[in-house]
């Protein structure tokens, strides 16, 4: 692949508005991934493990259940303890939604901007490790947001920042 097709010289990212010739197998994979979030995650999602470094995401059954639940319901509440892979699962869900739902807006909100950016960084790492035929072209890619050529947008912000920037009522 020519460097002309890379987003800002990053060989792992596809630039927006370039023509890609898909094989029949790639088309079938895109369709299958768009319909089955668990298959997409198990087959193409990469995560960082403290012990093993970059590795395929192998979700546990409860994580698969969360994926299906979020996919099928507008509102989901998960009562879970710390360190159970909630963030990893949600990053996978966010990436699936952004890729396969045009004009989808995703806000990653946390109590601190650095935490929200760290979660966005996990999503960016996973995105960079997708095969090109699954990637949407990149319109914007930075520490605080991503815009894909299908119109999907992902941004990271602190909740405290939102409080300070919201308009205050005046008499």
Task: Please name every model-derived segment.
Residues 2-166, 170:
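Phosphate/NTP-binding elements of NTP-utilizing enzymes
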């Amino acid at each position: 692949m020519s460097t002309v097709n890379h987003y800002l010289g990053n060989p792992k990212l596809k630039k927006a508005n370039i023509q890609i010739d898909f094989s029949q197998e790639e088309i079938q994979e895109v369709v299958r991934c768009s319909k089955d979030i668990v298959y997409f995650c198990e087959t193409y999602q990469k995560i960082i493990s403290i012990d093993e470094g970059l590795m395929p995401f192998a979700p546990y059954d409860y994580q698969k259940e969360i994926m299906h639940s979020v996919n099928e319901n507008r509102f989901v509440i998960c009562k879970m303890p710390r360190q159970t892979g909630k963030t990893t699962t949600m990053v996978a869900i966010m990436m699936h939604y952004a890729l396969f739902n045009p004009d989808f807006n995703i806000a990653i909100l946390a109590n601190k901007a650095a935490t929200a950016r760290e979660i966005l960084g996990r999503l960016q790492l996973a995105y960079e490790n997708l095969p090109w035929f699954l990637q949407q072209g990149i319109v914007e890619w930075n520490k605080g947001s991503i815009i894909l050529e299908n119109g999907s947008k992902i941004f990271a912000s602190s909740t405290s920042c939102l409080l300070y920037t919201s308009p205050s009522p005046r008499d």
